[in-house]
UniProtKB/Swiss-Prot annotation:
Enzyme category, top tier: transferase
Superkingdom classification of source: Bacteria
UniProt keyword Metal-binding, yes or no: yes
Short name of any one Pfam family annotated for the protein: TsaD
Binding site residues for substrate: L129, V130, S131, G132, G133, D162, G175, N268
Cofactor note: Binds 1 Fe(2+) ion per subunit.
Protein name in the entry: tRNA N6-adenosine threonylcarbamoyltransferase
Keywords in alphabetical order: Acyltransferase, Cytoplasm, Iron, Metal-binding, Transferase, tRNA processing
Any single GO BP term: tRNA threonylcarbamoyladenosine modification
Gene3D superfamilies per UniProt: 3.30.420.40
Residues the record lists as binding Fe cation: H107, H111, D296
Natural source organism: Nitratiruptor sp. (strain SB155-2)
Residue pairs linked by disulfide bridges in the UniProt entry: none
Keyword Translocase applies: no
Length: 329
């Protein structure tokens, strides 16, 4: 069994995964969304303190598995340095107490393996990763064989939702709030520009779209509930159209036989529907992680760690450090 820990941002989570068949034997997550909502975003120092409180409580619930643990896995990159450290400190303590190896896991690779929780990995795949901090198209051939085909030049898909929600006074996190509000709106009322529409480069950019929403808001007075819904719907439509356009371009270039979308923002139902329709047209199979595993969680870290364990890809204690910004390259 592998005990895995996730604390890269504002979710405290621990999981126990059986190595031989990937079975998830224990999984618990404590979200900090409510604590950060009044600040309009994650406050690193507060997040760190809340992890320090939550992780030991979760570990106490999983203590029956400790005698059977063969390795300790922990997210060590990328993320907020002060929150990553909370998970790393617990992992090192367990490593010393149980005398089992450590596995440092890249959080983004964890998102890829959220597709394969409790099952064998089916690769290669082209994977679109959409989250609060990242927007990437990946060519995934294996745990240690991942190539970045495209990334964002500025804001990520999820980050743009958070920032637009903050502009509109809708609170944090912005993704679910914008999505819910958009269901009541007219997505054609505001003609927000699709970023990089005519650009040849394979890249994403959300800063221009975000600024277009800011301009529209500044030009309106006494916004009604319907105005807010229309802005949310129009913004969401343009944001997804940009993802779709650049992913279609990647498919034309790389011709994948299999496609998947992962990350917290992949829980957006409008996004899922748009990509399901496009993949159906192209006869390309599409996969998503289960909704419960889209956002940050230790189950995906544990599943990725099984791959590392089977490759004897362990991390020395002194080398296990927090790496706030990283990638696969």
């Amino acid at each position: 069994m592998i005990l895995s820990i996730e604390s890269s941002c504002d979710d405290s989570s621990i999981a126990i995964t059986r190595i031989k068949d990937y079975k998830l034997l224990f999984h618990k997550k404590i979200s900090q969304e409510l604590a950060h909502s009044e600040y309009g975003g994650v406050v690193p120092e507060l997040a760190s303190r809340l992890h320090a409180e939550a992780l030991p409580k979760i570990l106490e619930e999983a203590k029956e598995f400790l005698p059977q643990i063969k390795a300790i896995a922990v997210t060590n990159e990328p993320g907020l340095s002060v929150t990553l450290l909370e998970g790393i400190m617990m992992a090192k303590a367990l490593h010393l107490a149980l005398n089992v190896p450590l596995i440092g896991v890249n959080h983004l690779i964890g998102h890829v393996y959220s597709l394969f929780i409790e099952k064998e990995a089916v690769l290669p795949k082209m994977v679109l990763l959409v989250s609060g901090g990242h927007t990437m198209i990946l060519d995934v051939k294996g745990y240690k064989d991942i190539k970045v085909l495209a990334t964002t030049l500025d804001d990520s898909f999820g980050e743009s939702f958070d920032k637009v929600a903050k502009m509109m006074g809708l609170g944090y996190p912005g993704g679910p709030v914008i999505e819910k509000l958009a269901q009541k709106g007219d997505a054609n009322r505001f003609d927000f520009p699709i970023p990089l529409k005519n650009a040849k480069e394979l890249a994403f950019s959300y800063s221009g779209l975000k600024n277009a929403v800011r301009l529209a808001l500044s030009e309106m007075e006494n916004l009604s509930e319907q105005d807010m819904a229309d802005i949310a719907a129009s913004f969401q439509k343009a944001a997804i159209a940009h993802l779709l356009q650049k992913t279609k371009k990647a498919c034309e270039i790389y011709k994948p036989s299999d496609f998947a979308i992962v990350g917290g923002a992949s829980a957006n139902m409008a996004l899922r529907k748009a990509f399901e329709q496009e993949c159906a047209k192209r006869a390309i199979p599409i996969a998503f992680a289960k909704l419960e595993y889209c956002s940050d969680n230790a189950a995906m870290i544990g599943r990725a760690a099984v791959e590392a364990f089977l490759m004897n890809d362990f991390t020395d204690m002194d080398a296990l450090v927090a790496i706030p910004r990283s990638c696969f390259v």
